[in-house]
């Protein structure tokens, strides 16, 4: 019986083994998770280098933060370095194996050269003998010749970027400032990597695996990847649920490092947030605790892999953060001796995961995203929004929501301030004269994200028009939406609607006062003045009424001058922001928060309202009999209240130019009447211009037949004889210039780089001459106390040649001089060096097989002591495991 069972088991095992043997393993794209950290090596200007290990082989892994590259505007330099190393297959250039990336970092996996850099060796030696310096310069010259023949300019050549191999040969590295000219504007492809041999017969040393080739041709992303579809994200995350749970248990945060008490409540928050956000991997989670104020949870995605690893990025610091490839795994923590969360805390936190999963099970990803999003239209939040917000409160304890912060702008004038935010964010009511229906253009843009910042004003305005939704019965609609929103959103929405209604009633009353002299039989539906003008004037009218004429006494406006403000117009678009005269007041108020909106908006718009006349009066002029009376009456009242100012403004005729706001769009269409005026029609108009300070406060085309001018002058006297033209360019400052920045180390910069001229491969030969002088003397030729003095020495070519016993040989001095030639066209290159007497004994064809004067003798394969001399000389303290 047992034997039979055993035989059956064996036969079944053979069947399973045969099936497994027939399966073809699917190769996985390379991932940074496959590498383990051994120790840090060095730190440069654009990243840190770590000693990594994979499959028993050591690699040098350069880690570059994407955020730093974005802040320094050098994202293209990281791409250039990757491409330059990927294209290079030379024995004198560091070999690049992988190019990987995650959500936060870019990883360049290169060969590890145990001999350190030449700068460290130079600090130990003091200076090199002529024979040693010639060999090093010869190998670097071959590397430069190879790069230049393949369209690559290094532009950062210095001893720090020359590494020493195990045999003592030189290899160039750090192509962060390199310039690649492939005569095309696309990224490198597979053919570029496979067909770039370093010699006539490519050796096996330069062959790459398919995974390496795939990683080297992948595109680098420097922005957070957008959220994927529900189906795709579900498929990706379903394969990593167990990995995600392990990751959440092994997280290292400042709280755990500081040995603070971790309560079950905080663990519940952590796990509930991680569990909830898995429905949308691209959605950031903010403020899990006060200690993780700036932490964000993102998807760590390899550049060439579709695998996604969930992680929580803690507050990075030199003493707490650890690279661990952004996944603070428990295995790495045990190896490095780091403090991890205790298992009893993990058990407590895992118990709460099922409860939180039940709460989030019925939620839709779209609903939860809309609930947490700071920029959305609250009218589209479904009925489950209240539950989502309740869950959000669990994830964000102690964090004031964005709606509450908007309401706390001014504790005294909540309604007024909120209304101003609403009106200046394009929430406007537009009346259609044909059917009398009202449209509401809703754009709740209280806070901007990167997409809003990058978008142009024209795109925003077009989007405003597309987002218009009908509100035929405002009260019923608002009541219907109240039942579908949370209490906080309802308060904001009700406040906005009620204020809009009160503002509209105010505007309607004031409009009746302005239009009292217009034809009595004209119906409101046929009124040529769009209702948007009334809404725009509500702010000014409210300022005048609520401040009890506080500022009227100090200004030159009379009581009747408010009528002019009712018909204020904008030069191009009256239904969208950007051209309104109130824009300047809003900008000033944002710069000076202590000053109330009433003060800034009212004080800056007094003169504007005085001289503003609606162009719509051109189509509906006053009756012939009432015209003169209205003009005389208004003119006399204006003169009575502000005679001195008007005399100053109108004594001399001024040519005016119609300006537009910087945020206004030029070619976008609009349905309001004033926007239909063409630019050529401005020639026939009288334009009034008033300046206050350094910018025009009001520039509005005056009405053809009626002009507010002193009664001593006739309208014919203010006609302009000069054609009015818009400026040809409104850009402030100098136009952007490509490669305007001076990048590199000051001592090794060529004169053409300092002068901002066009440069080519000759800049590398100049730097090679500086390195030759430094190898022979131990000090760069143009070294000085400050960078400015170094630049002056370079431009003057001030070289302090050694004298006496330290004097250089004539051949060495001449070689330095031909390399350090100011005229880049006459500067020496590889041909001149090969023919120079200093390099007469160099076997250029078999240079990589020659015995080098210095061969490193490390203690073991992980010895990094040869890099310490440079770090100590530059006072670089490489912390344990901080990025």
UniProtKB/Swiss-Prot annotation:
Protein function: Serine/threonine kinase that plays a key role in M phase by acting as a regulator of mitosis entry and maintenance. Acts by promoting the inactivation of protein phosphatase 2A (PP2A) during M phase: does not directly inhibit PP2A but acts by mediating phosphorylation and subsequent activation of ARPP19 and ENSA at 'Ser-62' and 'Ser-67', respectively. ARPP19 and ENSA are phosphatase inhibitors that specifically inhibit the PPP2R2D (PR55-delta) subunit of PP2A. Inactivation of PP2A during M phase is essential to keep cyclin-B1-CDK1 activity high.
Gene: MASTL
Protein name: Serine/threonine-protein kinase greatwall
Subcellular location: Cytoplasm, Cytoskeleton, Microtubule organizing center, Centrosome; Nucleus
GO BP annotation list: cell division; DNA damage response; G2/M transition of mitotic cell cycle; intracellular signal transduction; mitotic cell cycle
Residue numbers of Phosphoserine PTMs: 295, 373, 456, 555, 559, 634, 661, 672, 729, 879, 882
Domain named Protein kinase: residues: 35-839
Enzyme Commission number, as recorded: 2.7.11.1
Keyword set includes Mitochondrion: no
Family (UniProt): Belongs to the protein kinase superfamily. AGC Ser/Thr protein kinase family.
Main location (coarse class): cytoplasm
Gene Ontology molecular-function annotations: ATP binding; protein phosphatase 2A binding; protein serine kinase activity; protein serine/threonine kinase activity
